[in-house]
């Protein structure tokens, strides 16, 4: 009986602690990020087309920063593990874009942009 009571106390304590371990879903932050993302993507495309590789690299870094800020959020819809993996994929695609800018490789920049769009679309299918 004591074991059952102790287990009940532990479960009750954890149920109070675990929800506070992650921030609540911040729809305003997610919405603001999703409004900024297309702006950054347009900026990257414009700057890379003008062969402003430094400016395009800054745009890719802004995308990585934007997505990284959303890492702590627990999605209302979908699994947190998938949310985290998708964010890692988006950030890695942005880093590939930065590397492509450093190499002044227009084809690789376009591929990085396609990859960002792919992961953004996948994320929207799951979490939107």
Features from the language model and the residues they span:
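General structural signal for alpha-helix termini and helix-helix connectors
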Residues: 43-50, 72-76, 96-103
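Solenoid-repeat scaffolds in large eukaryotic assemblies
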Residues: 55-57, 63, 109-110
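Short, solvent-exposed, charged loop/turn and helix-capping segments
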Residues: 66-84
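C-terminal amphipathic alpha-helix
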Residues: 96-128
